[in-house]
Amino acid sequence: MEKASKNKESGVKKANNSFLQNFGVNTAGKENESTSLPRLPKSEDESIPKQSIKSKNKKKTQHFLSDAFESLKRQEIDTNEKEVIVSAPITSKPAQVFYSKKLERKDEGIRKWEKDPFAPISVKSGAWKKPYTKVPEVSINKATSKRTDLINDKPIVIPIPRASTSTLYFGKHNKPTSENRKGPIGIPTEEILTSQNTQAMLHKLFENNVLDNVKDDSMQRQSSFIPGMHIRLLDHQVQGLTWLKSRETVSKSSASGGILADDMGLGKTIQMIALILSHPLPKKKHSIKSTLVVAPLSLIKQWESEVQTKSKLTAIVYHGASRYKLLKVIHEYDVVITTYQILVSEWVSHNTTGTDGKSPTEAKSYEKKKPSLFAFYWWRIILDEAHTIKNKSSKSALACCALQGINRWCLTGTPLQNNVDELYSLVKFLHINPFNDQSVWKDQISLPLCQGEENLVFKRLRMLLSVIMLRRTKTLLEANAGKDGTGGALKLSKRLVYKVICKFEESERDFYSNLARNMERTMSNFVNSGKLGKNYTNILCLLLRLRQACNHPQSLNFQFEQDVDAFNALDGAANTNKLASDQDVDDLANLLETVEIGSRKKSFCTICMAELPPDFHEKKCKDCSRNFKELDKGIQDPNDKTLYKSSKIREILKILSLDEQEEDDTVRGLRKTIIFSQFTTFLDIIDLHLRKAGIGFVRYDGRMNNRAREKSLDLLRSDSGTQVLLCSLKCGALGLNLTCASRVILCDVWWNPAIEEQAIDRVHRIGQRRDVLVYKLVVENTIEEKIVELQNLKRDLAKQALGDGKKSVFTSKKLTLNDLLFLFNKRAAA
């Protein structure tokens, strides 16, 4: 024990000396010199208390990260971004140490003066309980001089996230070693986080911004034909391929891969197929040659078709009950395609205690015998529609992070939708050191944003994303195309967006007003009873009922469970309330998937959520029943109330009648239209009106199996009599190629504008020859107009983090309960 203590003490000394030398401090021969600062042990006989080291670990993290970022700043890394003025300068003069027992916590102004802009101090940091340093003001461009206030800083030990280790390795093949691999397997279970190796991690991350090393245009034109591909790449796809290959071959990096975040419709799938062909597995690598593609269910057949028709690669779909039989031959295929649901299912089976009450050890032994996707060490892992794992705590995110592989890629046109912390889940999956450690992300991104350092946070994010992410928008490519004189223009059709203001008829207006009044009364009861937070899910139900009333009054007569895509009833409804307080509005809307009104002990009105008397046997309260009776008086055909033409139904039929003759002879036939709605019940109502009008159509929603969905798409593409696709926004907004249509109707607005953009880009993409017409239906003076305001907040957030926004900053990353109240009454948000 004594020898071990000596060795540990010696190691700490060496680490401290090395750390000081990095800042120009000569430590030779100074071990026994005393200073006015906290001293190091004078000899090897003096032990270092383990508890002391452990207690100071957390306190020093801020200093180490500060020095690492400061060092990077001195090397003038070019991020191609405009300079952002930070709130406090960085010092180069020695710090003056002072302390007083009566010292109180600093106010906001003093803390801002003292803070290092590259390492904000957490409000919970232990630094407030110990001597602190007063930082003199100097120019940010001056070199940092010697530091004498950190002599006693000790290395900090942080645990590596479990998903980054080899704990889920079940394969029989040779496991890679630290010498012949790039990924996280082979590293110890704990890593020493000091300013030196943190700086090294950051150097590895920022030293190769391969966007600056893209080949010239002549090389791009020569390499547009990729051996093994049956099509020619466009210029921007060749440039993208150059970047993709560079990220997989970057030298001495602990992470190979990144985020391909091109706009929807620019060919991310084609670029990845080209990467698979142009950068195969080297023979010396200890992994299988296959690339694993994880995609939503609606896209797996499209991936298979793209791989097989546009390249010589072999592909197999890993899905269905008999999928385990494929594991014996899976290594023979170039591309293996599966879904997030399958991945979660197999991951959960590896993380349970087993069946029949087995112990964890027995269960682990049992699962080793059962093969799965986690038994392989993949050459490449691709997450299509990677924003699926935006919630770092979701099973999808945990399962994806548990996969073993060398090169890791995220494909998404919307890498950020609600708040900047969504990026952490992608960074964690990609193993981007040091930001894949949650404590580093919290200290460098989350806490500074909460403390008002928006400019600093967004500058850091843009610096990080400039290295690991390639993002090209359609507007940017069209603006830059052909500037070099090569004529390599990206030719996309125009996208014309029309906001259609729908006006209620008098009967509809009275119905909506009465409904809103009933719901405001229910909200008042929630507020007066002091149970507003506990009724979070009920509030969302009220909001969705109001949105349904904007579409068609009869939509409210459908039960929740009938609307598969909007409510998709699942088990576990009792847990929704405790989750609600920590979720964003977009995530809270997904909680409605667990709503089961009929399972509650108390009875509530299915329309306004008002509590019903114990002996009341109707599903609607008296006020809501009276409201429907008033509406029925204006319906011409009482036998079929769904054939009543609401304001939106009238606008939809009017838009479908606007087919005019195309001037371009190469484009013939009537326009085909995609009608998107979040409510399958509203699609059912549109279905009836299209049948009555004699308009040919097909369906694509969550109540259909995958084979039926593919059949609908084939009819839309090949049958001239099929003019309309009624599509669920949840099912059809991701990945589909619908260039056979040239018109989009968005029947209802959604909290998240990125979902709407994805839906539009199913039609407006490469291969579209017609101008795309987009009609967004919004009913005036209703909840829909307020939802549009919330959409604008989320757009600003995404623009700021991705570097293409205005100077104004989105200061609130969460939409709170007040935002929900605002949707009912503007005064509630004040």
Swiss-Prot record:
Residues 662-816 form the Helicase C-terminal domain. The modification Phosphoserine is found at residue 712. GO terms for biological process: DNA repair; nucleotide-excision repair. The keyword Disulfide bond does not apply. The keyword Translocase does not apply. ATP binds at residues 262-269. One of its GO terms (cellular component) is cytosol. Residues 15-25 have a biased composition (Polar residues). Residues 1-61 are annotated as: Disordered. Keywords: ATP-binding, DNA-binding, Helicase, Hydrolase, Nucleotide-binding, Nucleus, Phosphoprotein. One of its GO terms (molecular function) is damaged DNA binding. Residues 1-12 have a biased composition (Basic and acidic residues). InterPro entries: Helicase_ATP-bd, Helicase_C-like, P-loop_NTPase, SNF2-like_sf, SNF2/RAD54-like_C, SNF2_N, SNF2_RAD54_helicase_TF. It is an enzyme of class 3 (hydrolase). It comes from the Eukaryota. Residues 249-433 form the Helicase ATP-binding domain. A motif (DEAH box) lies at residues 384-387. It is found in: Nucleus. Its EC number is 3.6.4.-. SMART domains: DEXDc (SM00487), HELICc (SM00490). CDD domains: DEXDc_SHPRH-like, SF2_C_SNF. Belongs to the SNF2/RAD54 helicase family. This is Uncharacterized ATP-dependent helicase C582.10c. It comes from Schizosaccharomyces pombe (strain 972 / ATCC 24843). The lineage of its organism: Eukaryota, Fungi, Dikarya, Ascomycota, Taphrinomycotina.
